[in-house]
Amino acid sequence: MRNVVLLFAAQPEISRMVGAEPIAIKYFPFLVGREISKLSDGMSPSVKLAVPDTAPFQMSRRHFTIEQEGDSIIVRDYGSHNGTIVNGFMLGAGSRAFHAVLSPGENNIIAGTLISKFQFTCLV
């Protein structure tokens, strides 16, 4: 059994949205996306972490997943409009790559473009 993967908000604005404490990811896949509506619970049925965003959107409704694949932990762009940047490597959004293996230790994940506020640190 793999150790728990931890996801941290890497920007103060995101910490205010999701909390300053790390999110312990124990079950996979773990889907991150945009809040959909204030009329419902704001989450798509399979989204585990829903964050608010306003137009022009950086975060897609279903943006990226953190998954376990064999002995590896990977990030997979879920077909987002702006792509996902993992440790400086672009996934989706015109790139031919759609997943990246996370390294042991700290990994940087940006949902959207380089100017996106949706920046996370994932500890594997």
PLM-predicted stretches and their roles:
Residues 1-57, 101-108, 113-124:
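Intrinsically disordered, low-complexity acidic Ser/Thr-rich regulatory segments
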Residues 48, 63-65, 70-106:
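Forkhead-associated
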